[in-house]
Every structure is written in structure tokens, then in C-alpha cells.
């Protein structure tokens, strides 16, 4: 049997150097300018407001505000929601085998309970992007993300 060499993960110093290099690239400069802009600050503040719910994967009350994502979105299936007065993209990804069937029954102004493990943002979007892991309406679960196959 041959032993494959497993590349060791980069050190903290290597990761820091790689980040500095990326920040100096055109993409890095654009992202940092966006983060400093009023629109970027608004998105980052919205993400920060729900960070504790995300890290603890606790329930968040949301209201569906739109059944479609902003024009040009490339996030798969999702809806727009309002959580504590701020708007968010609630994204579920690409649909495989009708797993989102019950989510298609959502209507504007529906009050839902959501849970997520991840919130992200990108200069292309004017709202933080919440990964939908769990959705409940009228005390009934209408979506629960299946655990990943093969671990984590």
C-alpha cells in the first residue's frame, strides 16, 4: 500500500499573508470598498444583528416579504424575509427532487420561524444572505435541511 502525503494545513502566518495578498488584488479592493460603503455597512450590520441566533442555531421570527429574490440573483430557491425590522435573503440553494415543495406554499406576510447556521454577504446583494436550515409555519415544520451525507 502506498501512503499518500496529506498536505498540512497552512500556518496562521501563511493564511495571513494569503489574505493580505488577496486584499491587494482588484477583487479584494472592491470588497473592502463595498464593506466601507453605506450599503456594505447596512448589510454587515444586518448580519451582525442575527449573529447570536446563527451561532446558537436558535429560532428567529420572520415575515415573508417577497416570494422572489432580487433580479439577477444566483442563489437557487429563496424568499425575502424581514427579521426584527431588517430585510434578508432566505436562501435554500438549488432544488433537488421536490425537497422545497412545502416552501412553495409560502405567501407574502406569512409569519414563519426560521433557524440557520450561516449568514453571508456579497457586494452583489443589498441584503445579508441567510442559509435556510429549518422553517416552521403555524407550529408545523415545512422545511428541515437534511444532514450532509458523509459527515459534517
What are these regions (language model features)?
Residues 97-114:
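Short nucleic-acid-contacting surface segments enriched for D/E, G, S/T with interspersed K/R
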Residues 119-151:
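OB-fold/S1-family single-stranded nucleic acid-binding modules
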Amino acid at each position: 500500500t502506498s501512503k499518500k502525503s496529506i498536505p498540512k494545513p497552512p500556518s496562521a502566518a501563511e493564511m495571513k499573508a494569503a489574505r493580505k495578498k488577496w486584499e491587494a488584488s482588484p477583487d479584494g479592493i472592491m470588497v473592502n470598498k463595498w464593506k466601507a460603503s453605506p450599503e456594505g455597512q447596512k448589510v454587515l450590520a444586518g448580519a451582525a444583528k442575527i449573529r447570536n441566533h446563527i451561532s446558537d442555531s436558535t429560532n428567529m421570527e420572520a415575515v415573508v416579504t417577497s416570494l422572489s429574490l432580487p433580479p439577477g440573483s444566483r442563489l437557487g430557491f429563496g424568499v425575502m424575509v424581514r427579521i426584527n425590522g431588517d430585510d434578508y435573503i432566505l436562501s435554500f440553494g438549488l432544488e433537488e427532487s421536490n425537497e422545497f415543495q412545502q416552501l412553495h406554499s409560502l405567501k407574502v406576510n406569512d409569519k414563519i420561524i426560521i433557524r440557520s447556521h450561516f449568514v453571508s454577504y456579497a457586494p452583489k446583494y443589498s441584503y445579508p444572505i441567510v442559509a435556510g436550515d429549518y422553517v416552521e409555519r403555524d407550529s408545523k415544520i415545512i422545511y428541515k435541511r437534511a444532514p450532509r451525507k458523509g459527515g459534517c
